[in-house]
């Protein structure tokens, strides 16, 4: 594709009022667009007309191919990207206001002409009010999404599409599910407004491209199969997965392939497309993955990728840039599906370790972990550290991933492979050479998988057989003598102001720490994850780094991820967005509530990845391992009632409990057993697993009827019903609800947009959004809200259904 120019927004005048974002067509336009802007005087129609003429002049410049600011300088987007003849983003809104024709048809009386001029002046005034709102500092990404969803004016929608370029990338990324869902399920005007931004960002970021491709596939899956195949979402997804959106200034990277060893495998069964980073390994696979694009027969069969791949020597095609990452993800998902077929937890764990050991032979490669927030290459998976998590029917598992951070994923060389048995010397870090490979050696170790889709067939991978590996000496410059230095030397020693502490305080704190060192869990074959999750994160990082052949590198990082197969994480993603929005609201309103949103990657309608919460174990694991009440466990971990550590942990518990109680009430979160509530090392509780929210409940049993889960054990940790911390808890609940309802629209629109075209169980019934709005109690006074909070706390604490559900989980799943 060539350079892209975003057409200016077209704001068409109409004789009818512009619909408000809230959808109240009967209300005054001015009351909607000036809400929250402050006092704005009613402008004279002539002034409005003059302002419109100025905008028209800018539009004429825009159509002439000139994009300049009011100061005459080339424009730069707010997100830091230059215009570079692709994106035109004016300092003032690039809005085109089309005036009605001045010439009247023959026979029209002069009174009609006057009426037309009057309507034109009124429309111009209304458009000026809208422009003033769009130009104001109060116009943020949340308002832009609201107008894009609610407005029926193509001109307004096109203008908002242009304005997306002027917001920060991370602000727009938060609403990516909403943007793509609107693109798939709403009318063409909305789709046309959104597409230029999506295409532009896909050219910039490979991770953004992956996120878009995965979400487009997942949100299109609710459509009928015949409609889905020809939908706009499917077409955009194919465009993203092709090479057409690869940055134009980057040359196509040609894979460096070594002759395959004579293993007796047919070409269709060679699944490992090798780069020089691992070309020294002689690999024999008895697997049966999908045919890769390196097979010339497949190139003619595959509809999705044939148009975007180029033939090389009539035998090989250059892999599209997302292909290695897609196969990496596919491999992780296939492991989860195979684990689910095994009967015992111990067998699953052993199989998981073996599978990941095989996966390591394909690393390093040009792949990354999408849940991370920085550019990196995956170099190794410490397979012995992986654990299978608790699940009755499925086999979610937790892995740790070693990565090397880099400045730019696309342009940085893939790190050279270092064998596990490489002996490292004790030379100083100054003698550390750059361990990399040449530009020609950067082809990913994962082969292209054309038939990658959301159906079960595309995910299926036959069991991998034995893998025989020979490791001759690897030529990696002078990396044989890489120095080994301590983790302490890697930690940056930033200069800090001296802090003076009394010797008595130091002795007291040291004695408290020695007396109350956090306990370690015992290994349980039925729950192997408990020990792994209980280990402090920094200790785990140190231990894995010491045993890693890449641990000596200063840009080495350790990440973790939970891989889930057979679960629809689209509701989890929706819950993450709501939690993130509430967290931002409470920070803005300075309410000290604490919640921990964790990242979600939706891969398909039944698979995904989750960012683990570090230094946290479930309350079920706490009770099972310690055989103590929650309060006694706090005393064991943090010291007696009067210690600083206990008081700090108690405050953290109260602030997090209040935050999650409000979340559970607003979203109607169900399935709140102790396996889905974590407790971290600082005393916070963290709710996980938001698979049942809003209109859905487990098996539609309707067990949990209370507003949220508040057990007597929770109250005991707070100091009892008459304690100050319990009163503090109720005060936080009230403050949090008051703050949340001030920003109700920001929360509701996240949910409302995702309901469009969705078949998710959380949206069953026609009253989901109405009930959500009612839970904000906009009509209540603060005194009435205080009474409501008291009633909800009392009702939840005395709820018999909470006790029944906990008993049900204990009897059926053994959850304490």
Swiss-Prot record:
Residues covered by region (Activation loop): 687-711
Origin: domain of life: Eukaryota
Pfam short name (any one): PI4KB-PIK1_PIK
Cofactor (UniProt): Mg(2+); Mn(2+)
Domain PI3K/PI4K catalytic positions: 535-801
Tissue spec. comment: Strongly expressed in brain, kidney, lung, small intestine, uterus and adrenal gland. Weaker expression in liver, heart, skeletal muscle, thymus and testis. Not detected in spleen.
Residues the record lists as N-acetylglycine modifications: 2
Region (G-loop): 541-547
Catalysed reactions, as listed in the record: a 1,2-diacyl-sn-glycero-3-phospho-(1D-myo-inositol) + ATP = a 1,2-diacyl-sn-glycero-3-phospho-(1D-myo-inositol 4-phosphate) + ADP + H(+)
Residue numbers bearing the Phosphothreonine modification: 263, 438, 517, 519
Compositionally biased spans, kind Polar residues: 278-297, 306-318
E.C. no: 2.7.1.67
Enzyme class: transferase
Regulation: Inhibited by wortmannin. Increased kinase activity upon interaction with NCS1/FREQ.
Region spans: Interaction with ACBD3: 2-68
Modified sites of kind Phosphoserine: 258, 266, 275, 277, 284, 294, 428, 511
GO biological process: inner ear development; lysosome organization; phosphatidylinositol phosphate biosynthetic process; phosphatidylinositol-mediated signaling
Described purpose of this protein according to its UniProt entry: Phosphorylates phosphatidylinositol (PI) in the first committed step in the production of the second messenger inositol-1,4,5,-trisphosphate (PIP). May regulate Golgi disintegration/reorganization during mitosis, possibly via its phosphorylation. Involved in Golgi-to-plasma membrane trafficking. May play an important role in the inner ear development.
Subunit structure: Interacts with ARF1 and ARF3 in the Golgi complex, but not with ARF4, ARF5 or ARF6. Interacts with NCS1/FREQ in a calcium-independent manner. Interacts with CALN1/CABP8 and CALN2/CABP7; in a calcium-dependent manner; this interaction competes with NCS1/FREQ binding. Interacts with ACBD3. Interacts with ARMH3, YWHAB, YWHAE, YWHAG, YWHAH, YWHAQ, YWHAZ and SFN. Interacts with GGA2 (via VHS domain); the interaction is important for PI4KB location at the Golgi apparatus membrane. Interacts with ATG9A.
Name this protein carries in UniProt: Phosphatidylinositol 4-kinase beta
Gene: Pi4kb
